[in-house]
UniProtKB/Swiss-Prot annotation:
Record organism: Mus musculus (Mouse)
Domain SET per the UniProt entry, residue ranges: 214-336
Protein known as: Histone-lysine N-methyltransferase SETD7
One of the GO biological process terms: peptidyl-lysine dimethylation
Lineage: Eukaryota, Metazoa, Chordata, Craniata, Vertebrata
Subcellular location: Nucleus; Chromosome
Subunit structure: Interacts with IPF1/PDX-1.
GO cellular component: chromosome; nucleolus
Keyword annotations from UniProtKB, A to Z: Activator, Chromatin regulator, Chromosome, Methyltransferase, Nucleus, Repeat, S-adenosyl-L-methionine, Transcription, Transcription regulation, Transferase
Keyword Protein biosynthesis: no
Enzyme Commission numbers on file: 2.1.1.364
Length: 366
């Protein structure tokens, strides 16, 4: 992102002045294989120009006396973009960063190429971190907050490099010129980063999530023989995060090697990890820190599993609405068992699912 790294000029395509220096529009290739295309005045970059770096990233902007000045656009090799303000070739001032899908992931200030002042880090799931970064540009301090996807519910307190050490429930009351104003809830419980392991689901299994508690509750399912289900407390629109699916973290190999009866609350997180809510934690009297495992299956679901970076649980999955949902409506998801595993005649799924699948397919054929 720094526009004036020390590089040795190797080849010039374009007009040269009487001293053999680039003059006018030229393409200059450096010993590092970085390339610059733009306007020169007697060997110095002046006017519009663009660096093409060896790793596939680029930097484009307006140069004055060989240094990038004003608005510049740095494009990462993966397609992400940083739009920032440059002074004498260094990031100084407001900046915004977007991922390769065009989603805003950072908004704040830079000083001498480091993040500075109050900054916002936005996650793809809708949550965000906000606070005044330290001298290294890290979210470290005692006035940092994680803000849930509703942009109102927050956990405010002490963080180190974005990890919550001690957070209390707070409400984001207003944001003025990028600076948030929080009101901490009196008598709030204290939350901290508490990522599960293969043997520990949570250090405080009965401490509910404050965001989830406002949106869902557990009651007897309306689906026959399904036991308990997950219901919405409030009417919400589509694409709303409703609940979180935390659990112990085990391997796919462990899940595949055991009986289906033990896999009633397993959910794949990624290629290595499966989240599981085993006995006795499937009972809310033993575990209620998250409730996403209570959502039952439907072939016509109103919700979907989605990835989520949680301030307390770390990388997990959440339950997000597919459509508008009414208050008191049961939330359902498609469990997504493999209907056509290689070398097998039927779905790789528990018996109850296979029975429901046949019944659903029969209704679709009518």
């Amino acid at each position: 992102m720094d526009s004036d790294d020390e590089v040795v000029e190797e080849a010039v395509e374009g007009h040269l002045d009487d001293d053999g220096l680039p003059h006018g529009f030229c393409t200059v290739t450096y010993s590092s294989t970085d390339r610059f295309e733009g306007n020169f005045v007697h060997g110095e970059k002046n006017g519009r120009g663009k660096f093409f770096f060896f790793d596939g990233s680029t930097l484009e902007g307006y140069y004055v006396d060989d240094a990038l000045q004003g608005q510049g656009v740095y494009t990462y090799e993966d397609g992400g973009v940083l739009q920032g303000t440059y002074v004498d070739g260094e990031l100084n001032g407001p900046a915004q960063e977007y991922d390769s899908d065009g989603r805003l992931i950072f908004k704040g200030q830079y000083k001498d190429n480091n993040r500075h002042g109050v900054c916002w880090i936005h996650y793809p799931d809708g949550g965000s971190l906000v606070g005044e970064v330290n001298e290294d540009g890290e979210m470290t301090g005692e006035k940092i907050a994680y803000v849930y996807p509703d942009q109102r519910t927050a956990l405010y307190g002490k963080f180190i490099d974005g990890e919550m050490l001690e957070g209390k429930l707070a409400t984001l009351m207003a944001t003025e010129e990028g600076r948030p104003h929080f009101e901490v809830t009196s008598g709030s419980s204290v939350y901290h980063f508490d990522k599960s392991t293969s043997s520990c689901i949570s250090s405080d299994a009965l401490l509910p999530d404050p965001y989830e508690s406002e949106r869902v509750y557990v009651a007897d399912s309306l689906i026959s023989s399904a036991g308990e289900g997950l219901f919405s407390k409030v009417a919400v629109g589509p694409n709303t995060v409703m609940s979180f699916y935390n659990g112990v973290r085990i391997t796919h190999q462990e899940v595949d090697s055991r009986d289906w009866a033990l896999n009633g609350n397993t959910l794949s997180l990624d290629e290595e990890t499966v989240i599981d809510v085993p006995e006795p934690y499937n009972h809310v009297s033993k575990y209620c820190a998250s409730l996403g495992h209570k959502a039952n299956h439907s072939f016509t679901p109103n919700c979907v599993y989605d990835l989520f970076v949680h301030p307390r649980f770390g990388p997990i999955k959440c339950i997000r609405t597919l459509r508008a949902v009414e208050a008191e409506e049961e939330l359902t998801v498609a469990y997504g068992y493999d209907h056509s595993p290689p070398g097998k005649s039927g779905p790789e799924a528990p018996e109850w699912y296979q029975v429901e699948l046949k019944a659903f397919q029969a209704t679709q054929q009518k």
